[in-house]
């Protein structure tokens, strides 16, 4: 018995040099759409992270296609899970007034998409 409810494909993109807050803002637009609508939306969003998320979702589509069903189309699949978690932080310092060092935290994130 073949149950399509449990067939999923997942992709994790790690250590992206974009802040988690910026990526979550884009993922909030994309969740619960069909893949065709989500990819179309990501093409026209003017944010830096939309290209990375576009590639991650497209990769999860091809993983699903290769592993489960070769004849599946973009309209039949939906994004079930899309999240961004914080990654390791690169810590730098910048000289500040009166001989102090001012910390600079370059944030990274991990993106997980599941269809």
Swiss-Prot record:
UniProt GO BP: translation
Main location, first listed in the record: plastid
Entry-linked InterPro entries: Ribosomal_uL22, Ribosomal_uL22_bac/chlpt-type, Ribosomal_uL22_bac/org-type, Ribosomal_uL22_CS, Ribosomal_uL22_sf
Keyword terms of this UniProt record: Plastid, Ribonucleoprotein, Ribosomal protein, RNA-binding, rRNA-binding
Gene Ontology molecular function: rRNA binding; structural constituent of ribosome
Signal peptide: none
Subcellular location per the Swiss-Prot or TrEMBL entry: Plastid
SUPFAM superfamilies cross-referenced by the UniProt entry: Ribosomal protein L22
GO cellular component: large ribosomal subunit; plastid
Family of the protein in this entry: Belongs to the universal ribosomal protein uL22 family.
Role of this protein: This protein binds specifically to 23S rRNA. The globular domain of the protein is located near the polypeptide exit tunnel on the outside of the subunit, while an extended beta-hairpin is found that lines the wall of the exit tunnel in the center of the 70S ribosome.
Assembly information from the UniProt record: Part of the 50S ribosomal subunit.
Entry protein name: Large ribosomal subunit protein uL22c
The species this protein was found in: Euglena longa (Euglenophycean alga)
Lineage summary: Eukaryota, Discoba, Euglenozoa, Euglenida, Spirocuta
